[in-house]
Structures are given as C-alpha cells and as structure tokens.
Amino acid sequence: MARRNEERGDRRNREEERDSEIVEKLVHINRVAATVKGGRRFSFAALMVVGDQKGRVGFGHGKAREVPEAIRKATEEAKKSMIRVPLRESRTLHHDGAGRWGAGKVMVRAAPPGTGVIAGGPMRAVLETLGVQDVVGKSVGSSNPYNMVRATFEALKAQSSPRQVAAKRGKKVSDVIGRRADGASAAQPAADAEG
C-alpha cells in the first residue's frame, strides 16, 4: 500500500514538473450574453494556447461567469489536447504546410536561422508556444481567432519528419532526404549527366 502511494506521489510530482515547463498564452477573451426572461446573463469565453516550447502545443476553450475561471477551464482543456509536432533542429518546421478551418486558411513555411516568428495574432501565439524560432506564417480569409488557431493546428498536424516519412515508405532516412553515402545529393548525378 505504501509503495502504491509513493508511485502516485511520483506521478503527481512528474505532472507538476511538466506543468511548470508549460507556457500559457491567452489568445482571445469574449463576453457573451444569454438572453433570459429577466434580461441578459453575461459570461466570458476564453481561448488559450499552451506549449512546452519543445514541440508540444495544445489549445482550449473555456466558458464561465468570471474571467479567471474561464481562463482556468481553457488552460485545462488545452493541456489535455496537446499534440506533438516534429521540429527541424529544434527551431523550425520540416516543410511548408497549409491548414483550413471554416473560412480561415493559414500557410506556414520553414525559414532559415535568424528569420524569427513572422506571423500575426493567434497564429503567432501557437507557433511561439510550440517553440518554433524561425517560421513565416500567412493567414488568408477569416480572422476569427478560433478559426485561425484551429487552421494552424491542422497545418501543424500535417507536419512529418524525414524519419516518419522513411518509416511510412519503408526506406532509409538517407534515401528520403536525398543523400548518398559519399555525401553528394541525389540531384547531383543528374546535373553532371546533362553537362
């Protein structure tokens, strides 16, 4: 029995450690009203994005009569819905991608070192909490924060690392990224043959 309690304590400590590393960003807060027979009843809706800045990110939506409670609910939901996104060199995305949710469309592009996070509003919050340091993002269509966040997540879910692509195709990573054993790229022999 004592051992089980120790294990439970360890699990709680690990969860607390993991939570202490998580960065939380409030993307949007909205006052909503329900019309009831006595007039209007106001409540607040919060949209939060959380991430560990090491490739994990999640978003959540919370509603409550008070702002802090709405934020707490949104944060809890965001922590439960976290996804892992493979990052190249722990600083950028592996490839360009696009996502769509409703009328909101977003495009994300991998960028060279020193570019920074070039993205606006809700998209920027998602990419910063993910831990991306160099990326270019563009939003087209709806600027509704909920649609933008969801569209960004759709684009991020489509990201795959060379290792994942190689496993899916049943090949070696070096075959997928086009490198040969001698270090020349696969495109080199074709260029040599033409010239």
Swiss-Prot record:
<dbReference type="InterPro" id="IPR014721">
    <property type="entry name" value="Ribsml_uS5_D2-typ_fold_subgr"/>
</dbReference>
<comment type="similarity">
    <text>Belongs to the universal ribosomal protein uS5 family.</text>
</comment>
<dbReference type="InterPro" id="IPR000851">
    <property type="entry name" value="Ribosomal_uS5"/>
</dbReference>
<comment type="function">
    <text>Located at the back of the 30S subunit body where it stabilizes the conformation of the head with respect to the body.</text>
</comment>
<dbReference type="Pfam" id="PF03719">
    <property type="entry name" value="Ribosomal_S5_C"/>
</dbReference>
<dbReference type="InterPro" id="IPR020568">
    <property type="entry name" value="Ribosomal_Su5_D2-typ_SF"/>
</dbReference>
<feature type="region of interest" description="Disordered">
    <location>
        <begin position="164"/>
        <end position="195"/>
    </location>
</feature>
<comment type="subunit">
    <text>Part of the 30S ribosomal subunit. Contacts proteins S4 and S8.</text>
</comment>
<protein>
    <recommendedName>
        <fullName>Small ribosomal subunit protein uS5</fullName>
    </recommendedName>
</protein>
<dbReference type="InterPro" id="IPR013810">
    <property type="entry name" value="Ribosomal_uS5_N"/>
</dbReference>
<dbReference type="Pfam" id="PF00333">
    <property type="entry name" value="Ribosomal_S5"/>
</dbReference>
<dbReference type="GO" id="GO:0019843">
    <property type="term" value="F:rRNA binding"/>
</dbReference>
<feature type="domain" description="S5 DRBM">
    <location>
        <begin position="22"/>
        <end position="85"/>
    </location>
</feature>
<dbReference type="InterPro" id="IPR005712">
    <property type="entry name" value="Ribosomal_uS5_bac-type"/>
</dbReference>
<feature type="compositionally biased region" description="Basic and acidic residues">
    <location>
        <begin position="172"/>
        <end position="182"/>
    </location>
</feature>
<dbReference type="GO" id="GO:0015935">
    <property type="term" value="C:small ribosomal subunit"/>
</dbReference>
<feature type="compositionally biased region" description="Low complexity">
    <location>
        <begin position="183"/>
        <end position="195"/>
    </location>
</feature>
<keyword id="KW-0694">RNA-binding</keyword>
<dbReference type="InterPro" id="IPR018192">
    <property type="entry name" value="Ribosomal_uS5_N_CS"/>
</dbReference>
<dbReference type="InterPro" id="IPR005324">
    <property type="entry name" value="Ribosomal_uS5_C"/>
</dbReference>
<keyword id="KW-0687">Ribonucleoprotein</keyword>
<keyword id="KW-0699">rRNA-binding</keyword>
<dbReference type="GO" id="GO:0006412">
    <property type="term" value="P:translation"/>
</dbReference>
<dbReference type="GO" id="GO:0003735">
    <property type="term" value="F:structural constituent of ribosome"/>
</dbReference>
<keyword id="KW-0689">Ribosomal protein</keyword>
<comment type="function">
    <text>With S4 and S12 plays an important role in translational accuracy.</text>
</comment>
